A protein has these predicted regions:
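Short glycine/serine-rich loop segments
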Residues: 1-65, 222, 226-245
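A short helix-breaking turn/cap at a secondary-structure junction
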Residues: 24-110, 266-288
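Short helix-loop capping/hinge segments that flank enzyme active sites or metal/cofactor-binding pockets
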Residues: 87-96, 142-195, 232, 236-243
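Short, well-ordered beta-strand elements
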Residues: 50, 240-249, 256-260, 264, ...
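Short connector loops at secondary-structure junctions
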Residues: 125-140, 171-173
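Acyltransferase
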Residues: 106-131, 152-160, 184, 188-205
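Short amphipathic alpha-helical coupling segments at ligand-binding clamshell hinges
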Residues: 57-61, 111, 187, 240, ...
């Protein structure tokens, strides 16, 4: 039995496998866990976090691994105060209203709405509607591509990328060398503006609830560095697990974990085991 695992995420690789396997995944605030010794993909977006059975387990693992070790210059030691007995009703909570209202192609919408009802009616959480900044987030996706090309430059120039398993990544690494420096710099300038707008959204709340696979949350928060906790909240008719997410303010990992923990006290989806023969769900919004 595996008690926990450690994942790395650049754009979905903690939240996506956690969802697919019916477990709880915590992608921390950027810089809260040292990445020393881990393979780089995007220096400005890579994050390391726990993947566990429950939010409380994630909190315990995170408490052990967070902080600077002097080997990763982006890592910071910021106090992490985990109290599973704190009243979750003291949190200022929002929900991504527009994302929950979009019915088209939203096959797990009823499960997500049931989670919102449980938060309100069973736990007593008061939630206010919030919206992500209206911004062309997709236009900044090539930041990851450019940084991945830099991270794997030696592999590409040596020709050893031909030894990789057949996929799109070798060509991605090669073509990244054609991205103009001006475009990369301007994309990061736009990213900084987006971070400022996102901070305004979080100004009056500690955490917001959002669909994991809709609303652009995964891509947006990996650009801004905000923490996200994805927890199981139901299954498809075929037995495929689904999840819902809790996004915290910067360095408010404890708050996001607390709200996730509170929901897991009134539900048992995190204790169930997915059917290993279940059909896989469609690919999430970018998973690296």
């Amino acid at each position: 039995c595996v008690g926990f695992s450690i994942g790395t995420e650049t754009r979905g690789s903690i939240t996506s496998p956690s969802t697919r396997n019916g477990i709880t995944g915590h992608r921390p605030t950027f810089g809260r866990v040292s990445r020393a010794g881990a393979m780089a993909l995007s220096w400005s977006m890579d994050k390391i976090g726990p993947m566990c059975r429950s939010a409380e387990d994630c909190a315990l693992v995170f408490a052990a691994i967070h902080g600077s070790d002097g080997l990763d210059p982006t890592a910071r030691t910021v106090p992490f105060s985990w109290d599973p007995y704190r009243d979750p009703r003291t949190l200022r909570v929002g929900y991504l209203a527009n994302a929950f209202e979009q019915a088209s192609g939203y096959d797990n919408r009823e499960l997500d709405l049931a989670t919102l009802r449980a938060l309100r009616e069973e736990i007593g959480i008061e939630m206010v509607p919030v919206e992500l900044p209206d911004f062309p987030v997709g236009a900044m996706n090539f930041i990851l591509t450019a940084e991945a090309g830099a991270a794997f430059e030696e592999l590409t120039l040596s020709g050893r990328d031909d030894l990789m398993e057949n996929s799109s990544w070798p060509n991605t690494f090669r073509t990244s060398r054609l991205i103009p420096a001006v475009d990369y710099i301007n994309a990061n300038r736009a990213r900084t503006i987006y971070m400022q707008h996102f901070s305004e959204v979080m100004r009056d709340i500690d955490v917001f609830v959002a669909p994991t696979r809709r609303g652009g949350v995964v891509g947006a928060t990996n650009l801004t560095g905000h923490p996200q906790v994805a927890i199981p909240n139901g299954f498809s008719e075929q037995g495929t697990p689904y999840s819902i997410s809790f996004v915290g303010g910067l360095y408010k990992d404890a708050e996001a974990l607390l709200l996730a923990h509170a929901y897991q006290q009134v539900s048992d989806f995190h204790l169930r085991h997915p059917d290993i023969d279940a059909q896989p769900m469609p690919q999430e919004e970018g998973s690296q």
